[in-house]
């Protein structure tokens, strides 16, 4: 399965008639492996800050998680494994695997729990595959 197929079929999948607003799979270095057409253009320093938070959980809390110029308030995640952010009626989930970062961005009516499930399920699968 290609990386783009993972984004199209596993991340942008239909859930009760709704789907993520945007999704992507990036390398730890910020290289884009695959993304939805709606995924925001991000700055390299935004990915660097996200990677730092995985190494030093809580480092994003004071400044927020920035992605494509949008600021998300960091909410409880799983230190070193998952970062979650909230902005208004939407948010973002980032799951770190051995080699990749899996991103999901959502807006209502999708719920934070649905976004977490989609992103973390693919992330766990990639970890099981050694990726």
UniProtKB/Swiss-Prot annotation:
Q: Report one GO cellular component.
A: cytoskeleton
Give the chief site where it resides: cytoplasm
Q: Record's Gene3D superfamilies?
A: Dynein light chain 2a, cytoplasmic
Q: Which InterPro entries match?
A: PFN, PFN_euk, PFN_sf, Profilin_CS
Keyword list, A-Z:
Actin-binding, Allergen, Cytoplasm, Cytoskeleton
One Pfam match, given by its short name, reads Profilin
Q: Which PROSITE patterns match?
A: PROFILIN
Cellular localization per UniProt = Cytoplasm, Cytoskeleton
Gene Ontology molecular function, alphabetical: actin monomer binding
SMART domains documented for this protein:
PROF
Q: Where is the signal peptide?
A: none
Q: Which domain of life is it from?
A: Eukaryota
Q: How does it assemble?
A: Occurs in many kinds of cells as a complex with monomeric actin in a 1:1 ratio.
Report the protein's function. Answer: Binds to actin and affects the structure of the cytoskeleton. At high concentrations, profilin prevents the polymerization of actin, whereas it enhances it at low concentrations. By binding to PIP2, it inhibits the formation of IP3 and DG.
What is the name attached to this protein's record? Answer: Profilin-1
Q: Which species is this record about?
A: Malus domestica
